[in-house]
From Swiss-Prot:
<keyword id="KW-0949">S-adenosyl-L-methionine</keyword>
<keyword id="KW-0479">Metal-binding</keyword>
<dbReference type="GO" id="GO:0051539">
    <property type="term" value="F:4 iron, 4 sulfur cluster binding"/>
</dbReference>
<feature type="binding site">
    <location>
        <position position="40"/>
    </location>
    <ligand>
        <name>[4Fe-4S] cluster 1</name>
    </ligand>
</feature>
<comment type="similarity">
    <text>Belongs to the radical SAM superfamily. Lipoyl synthase family.</text>
</comment>
<protein>
    <recommendedName>
        <fullName>Lipoyl synthase</fullName>
        <ecNumber>2.8.1.8</ecNumber>
    </recommendedName>
</protein>
<keyword id="KW-0411">Iron-sulfur</keyword>
<dbReference type="InterPro" id="IPR003698">
    <property type="entry name" value="Lipoyl_synth"/>
</dbReference>
<feature type="binding site">
    <location>
        <position position="68"/>
    </location>
    <ligand>
        <name>[4Fe-4S] cluster 2</name>
    </ligand>
</feature>
<comment type="pathway">
    <text>Protein modification; protein lipoylation via endogenous pathway; protein N(6)-(lipoyl)lysine from octanoyl-[acyl-carrier-protein]: step 2/2.</text>
</comment>
<keyword id="KW-0808">Transferase</keyword>
<feature type="binding site">
    <location>
        <position position="35"/>
    </location>
    <ligand>
        <name>[4Fe-4S] cluster 1</name>
    </ligand>
</feature>
<dbReference type="GO" id="GO:0005737">
    <property type="term" value="C:cytoplasm"/>
</dbReference>
<dbReference type="Pfam" id="PF04055">
    <property type="entry name" value="Radical_SAM"/>
</dbReference>
<dbReference type="InterPro" id="IPR006638">
    <property type="entry name" value="Elp3/MiaA/NifB-like_rSAM"/>
</dbReference>
<keyword id="KW-0004">4Fe-4S</keyword>
<feature type="domain" description="Radical SAM core">
    <location>
        <begin position="47"/>
        <end position="263"/>
    </location>
</feature>
Amino acid sequence: MKIQRKPEWLRKKVPQGEQAAMRGLLSELKLNTVCQQALCPNIAECFGCGQATFLILGRDCTRQCSFCNVDKAPRPQAPDADEPRRLAEAVLRLKLSHVVITSPTRDDLADGGAGHYAATVAAVREVSPGTAVELLVPDFGGDHAALATVLAAQPSILAHNLETVPRLYEVRKGADYQRSLDLLQQAALRAPAIPTKSGIMLGLGEELDEVRAVLQDLRRVGCSYLSLGQYLAPSKRHQPVVAYIPPQQFDLLRDEALALGFRHVESGPYVRSSYHAANYA
């Protein structure tokens, strides 16, 4: 496959901010971020203004998604029982009004890490009760009891990314489109006061009508919030980019999604699921 050259609209200017302070805090508290692990293109912007998406439950994922830069391992390290406290301290010291917390998929754990998510929410609420806590969770292998554990912690937003259209789900090793959709539906049914959110990457070879069908599926299961962004391959070893989607198409899809009833939509080439996360709350 011919390697696509990045168009002009993806030549992002890197802002100069106080990144060193953020990196120092993360190092001091021994915390991971998906910003660093996934090579997020917005890391300079977010770190520069004191924002980060925290990665709990270790740095290793038990699945082999071909688009993702997070490390893989069949048996990652056991959860760090002190991690929730340290993350809460970071939230307090950064004075965050909105925090996003995610994790690798942990199929090796009986509850998929749900209890650790709940403990982290509780720790943040104890020291910073006014902070909105958004959780971006894996599919927990379809375990409804694990989902119930997370919902019982009462996060401000429960997010789970569909990532792409059903036809291309081979890039999500071990995942299932219907199972992911069911998680969002179950969350909306079990805890209607907690809004749900999902994200889709464009540029993997999907057709526009396939994306529209996914948006309709999300609204059918009660999903409130949506992010749409351009897939960028972390390296030549990862899933290649099939197409660079022009900004005008992101604008079109945002307008169509809002017309379907999504409460808030972030749509653009550099949008990621936690980018401008406070705009959803």
